[in-house]
Amino acid sequence: MNWEIVIGLETHTQLSTDSKIFSGSSTRFGAAPNTQANAVDLALPGSLPVMNRGAAERAILFGLAVGGKVAPRSVFARKNYFYPDLPKGYQISQYELPVVEGGTLSFFVGEEEKTVNLTRAHLEEDAGKSLHDEFSLASGAPASGIDLNRAGTPLLEIVTEPEMRSAAEAVAYARALHSLVVWLGICDGNMQEGSFRCDANVSVRPVGQKEFGTRTEIKNVNSFRFLERAILFEARRQIELIEDGGTVVQETRLYDADRDETRSMRSKEDAHDYRYFPDPDLPPLVIGQDWIDAVRAGMPELPAAQRARFEADYGLPAYDAAQLTVSRAMADYFEAVARALPAGQAKLAANWIMGEVAATLNREEKDIDAAPVSAAALAALINRIIDGTISNKIARDVFAAMWAGENGGDADAIIEARGLKQISDSGAIGAMIDEVLAANPAIVEEYRAGKQKAFNSLVGQIMKAAKGKANPQQVNELLKEKLG
């Protein structure tokens, strides 16, 4: 039997406010435990929550960016459950009336464009954190501690429809969402610090069946690689379970990266288990059109619009434009390089950024912001390819030297110091060609007999004689001329 995987994602995006969603405590990461929790965060009697306007503005910005409906009136609700790091005994969230409804997000899986519909995005507070390895009793027995610094940190939970059909598609969506929230400046995107966490709802069904299978939820996956592995394992587990005559149980599961498996945490609750009801301490969040218009006026150019502009203004293929707009920093870098080149050379800039620059960044695990070769420096290097000073092959060596900081990272200085200027003198190139032809009469005869590989062999020997510095185009033209 052939099976289809059905995936929906719930992503907890930590909003980049300086203070918490309902209190004035700092959201700074890494402080000593319980030093950033005030009376509201600790749920002390008499303390009342006050809504953080900045969190609401970031939610509005996201809603506009995905084409969702920003609710003119949304309501905060109490989500009731017990957990040691939830001091109030409930979490303030949104249920029936979220701040954003609907919207879409488009992304690429390889070179195929996909679009996923969003169900909603709602504001809520984060819980605290249980610490299990840092404490022990006087007797030496293990103990747990609670750090409430994170309690009350503002989150925007973004929920998709169950429309994704592969782990690769889910990861591509998650990457696109991560890119968007960082692009908008509403989240720093730091997955190691928990700023962007995914819950994956996974089920399987026979191909062609309309009804969904029983889903499980994989909680708090904080890396794209682990997200893909967790979904693949869980789908495989469910298929094997059903084929062996078992039944999938609706439950919450945790992904264990060390064992590359999911394991059961608890039975999965339904909404009625949380006994949602409107929070009496918080008035409805009312968002007028003036507020929405003000947020829209401050929006940056969105990735989709920038992709379309790169295709129209620079003649880039859709795939290239998508790759160059994975982040605002990458898009700005490309545009700065392209603008410093002669008209019609933007594709060459794109090739270099998607090739040498991206490969080096990936190898060193750096972001484009940390690239030691600036956009202006890269443009200077590419201009030396365009004007024939160096070949594309030599340029790669120069780029590596620039990255390492040789000669201050200046392309011209490196070319001069290493004597890398391309030989473009037709007389000098012609003399080299004559020597190679004289030394290889058999290969010349093979070419004249119609063997194209013989021509390539001659070109290789000429370039070797020139130590890679001969202009390849001139070599090809003069060689053809001499061979007749």
From Swiss-Prot:
Q: Which Pfam families match?
A: GatB_N, GatB_Yqey
Give a GO molecular function annotation for the protein: glutaminyl-tRNA synthase (glutamine-hydrolyzing) activity
Classification via SMART domains: GatB_Yqey
Catalyses: L-glutamyl-tRNA(Gln) + L-glutamine + ATP + H2O = L-glutaminyl-tRNA(Gln) + L-glutamate + ADP + phosphate + H(+); L-aspartyl-tRNA(Asn) + L-glutamine + ATP + H2O = L-asparaginyl-tRNA(Asn) + L-glutamate + ADP + phosphate + 2 H(+)
InterPro entries of this UniProt entry?
Asn/Gln-tRNA_amidoTrfase_suB/E (IPR017959), Asn/Gln-tRNA_Trfase_suB/E_cat (IPR006075), Asn/Gln_amidotransferase (IPR018027), Asn/Gln_tRNA_amidoTrase-B-like (IPR003789), GatB (IPR004413), GatB_C_1 (IPR042114), GatB_Yqey_C_2 (IPR023168), Gln-tRNA_amidoTrfase_suB_CS (IPR017958)
Record bears the keyword Cell cycle: no
Q: Which family does it belong to?
A: Belongs to the GatB/GatE family. GatB subfamily.
UniProt subunit comment: Heterotrimer of A, B and C subunits.
* HAMAP family attached to this UniProt entry: GatB
What the protein does? Allows the formation of correctly charged Asn-tRNA(Asn) or Gln-tRNA(Gln) through the transamidation of misacylated Asp-tRNA(Asn) or Glu-tRNA(Gln) in organisms which lack either or both of asparaginyl-tRNA or glutaminyl-tRNA synthetases. The reaction takes place in the presence of glutamine and ATP through an activated phospho-Asp-tRNA(Asn) or phospho-Glu-tRNA(Gln).
Protein name in the entry: Aspartyl/glutamyl-tRNA(Asn/Gln) amidotransferase subunit B
From which source organism is this entry? Bordetella pertussis (strain Tohama I / ATCC BAA-589 / NCTC 13251)
Q: What is the lineage of its organism?
A: Bacteria, Pseudomonadati, Pseudomonadota, Betaproteobacteria, Burkholderiales
Designated gene of the protein: gatB
